[in-house]
Amino acid sequence: MMSTSVPDAVLGVLDSSLDTGDEAITITTVDEDGWPRTALLSIAEAVLTGKGRIAILLHDASTGAINLRRDGRLLVTVAAGGNVYDLRFSVQENGPILADPPRATFTGALCAVREQRAPYATVTSGIRFTLHGPQSVLPRWHNQLTHLRSSVEKF
């Protein structure tokens, strides 16, 4: 089923506490040959508003950043509320490169949402991970989220 509204369950995942910080989302971009390229982002690398505006951080020289600069089509996949959601966005690079490591900010607007569900099964989790050094990662994540929230508000 397609819609243009951000599901509350998706907003709940992206608003998860950084204290657990174990949720990942998948992004898909299109490379120069037309093939899909996937990457994982932590919840500290994406901010989504209820109005369908998104801001993400990618390593500046990553394939995803290169693809978005060229094409601007972004698919974000999130497991939430017992389902999987594909959110399509049109994005562009926005603002200066963040340093250490160099990261690019992309902002954009929601184009469509596709909900994937099966009557015979419930999705119980998406991709999860464990931080090896949360004490060194979490302060950076807090700074990233502050930057992304500011970027998405300006968009």
Predicted feature residues:
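Binding-site signature for planar aromatic cofactors or substrates
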Residues: 1-155
